[in-house]
């Protein structure tokens, strides 16, 4: 195949800027999918993606346009799924920068554009939704030039919803995006593994971008990270349904089935090469992202532990950022500690486990990795608050800090700065983008951001603010472990790490919430928040009382007293042996303790 006729590209856009709609129009205009078969958000295969109106998993599809072959790699736009974007950009030569004509550049768009610029991709600016009454094309063009530093003079104006300007986009892909680098078929194979998923019949299917050489059915290849060898049984392209081929050549994007049965054998971002004619070094520039938060997942039914284990293994195949290890809790039994890229990432996984594998999950409150220096000089990295040493054994605690870049209209500046101060933020800079928009830069503790920062940011700015962040370093902080006792017993899964200055209001807020959420029992349940051995907040869940005197009528009052005394003794006995039922909402209550006020 002539390399000069191939174009590989991705679409960069913020949530709701019309990326999946543009992908639909391209599929429709090129007759890749007939109008009859085309569904909205055609490349978003998960029900969750369609319901939430977001792209979670990337998708790769081959499109024929005149004599050219395009490989469109559809990418997510949410901050939690940056790792998906980095994968797709590593497999392309160009990117369509899609910006909403009424909303302009958003923080996550900018983060992804910088990723594209780092990969030396050709960027084509496209302004979408030009048919909206609130569209301001000139303002958006100026924003693109001032913020990103690329010319927007020839930006393509489109309405993806109404199909306006789609042909201009296709012509720009042909004329502006460079073809893949030429390579001889005899060159050693180098192919980037940019995605994978588990097929119950064929094992792990890997998606690759061939950079040099070629790969054919029957070839034996190896992963360069772990040297494991497999033979190609089937390979082909997605158009968007899978189409089998005999070989994939340099510049092509396709899938490979090789009877890979073990999920852990595939590492997304790895390079594959042929055993007979191996490449000397893997492809450069791929970054493996590290989880930023950790959560405990426990099956409600302890019999489902093995099902949860198998389900996580299958899902982790198509989501390489998930890291998990077994853990146990006195309150919840056996489960897993799972690393995520953010709260949305965690919610998506929990929903997938419940929908696709019929699991009922209890998720504990998220935490981050803390660096703890013990009094004997030993340094530990701990992500589970219940594993923290006692306070008298801790010399210092360091927590991860992020550099947050927040884009917002000028009118919301005061409220957003107040939010950052509430979250223990350290002011860094304020940049003026234009007459109306500002970029606010703060250093913030990561543990404060993973809870509700994104929701509160959107709420305070009426949805107009957006932000991106990167973890920069660890800093010493005055942190303490807050434990919760129910009926005198420590519930390890409810432990949390709080800043010393906010411990009392947080403890008070949490005990009040738990009092409302935990159902009443037939015995009184004290809810206590403790630091070390000191109780700093307490609430009591009153017992419900069965009317043991209902059967009495008339008669002696001593009979009534006797029954009530018997009930009282029974409750006392039940209190000492009783088990308190803790619903899922109790763990979620920790997420909603926003009290960062002294």
Swiss-Prot record:
Keyword set includes GTP-binding: yes
UniProt-listed SUPFAM superfamilies: EF-G C-terminal domain-like, P-loop containing nucleoside triphosphate hydrolases, Translation proteins
Picking any one GO biological process from the record gives: positive regulation of translation
Q: Which InterPro entries match?
A: EF-4, EFG_III/V, EFG_V-like, EFTu-like_2, G_TR_CS, LepA_C_sf, LepA_CTD, LepA_IV
Record domain tr-type G: where: 4-181
Task: State the reactions this protein catalyses.
Answer: GTP + H2O = GDP + phosphate + H(+)
Annotated GO molecular function terms are: GTP binding; GTPase activity; ribosome binding; translation elongation factor activity
This protein's GO CC annotations: plasma membrane
Instruction: Give a single Pfam family match.
Output: GTP_EFTU
Location, primary (coarse class): membrane
* Gene3D superfamilies, sorted: 3.30.70.240, Elongation factor 4, C-terminal domain (3.30.70.2570), Elongation Factor G (Translational Gtpase), domain 3 (3.30.70.870), P-loop containing nucleotide triphosphate hydrolases (3.40.50.300), Translation factors (2.40.30.10)
The way this protein sits in the membrane is described as:
Peripheral membrane protein
Q: What does this protein do?
A: Required for accurate and efficient protein synthesis under certain stress conditions. May act as a fidelity factor of the translation reaction, by catalyzing a one-codon backward translocation of tRNAs on improperly translocated ribosomes. Back-translocation proceeds from a post-translocation (POST) complex to a pre-translocation (PRE) complex, thus giving elongation factor G a second chance to translocate the tRNAs correctly. Binds to ribosomes in a GTP-dependent manner.
In Swiss-Prot or TrEMBL terms, this protein is called Elongation factor 4
The record lists the organism as Mesomycoplasma hyopneumoniae (strain 7448)
Q: What is the lineage of its organism?
A: Bacteria, Bacillati, Mycoplasmatota, Mycoplasmoidales, Metamycoplasmataceae
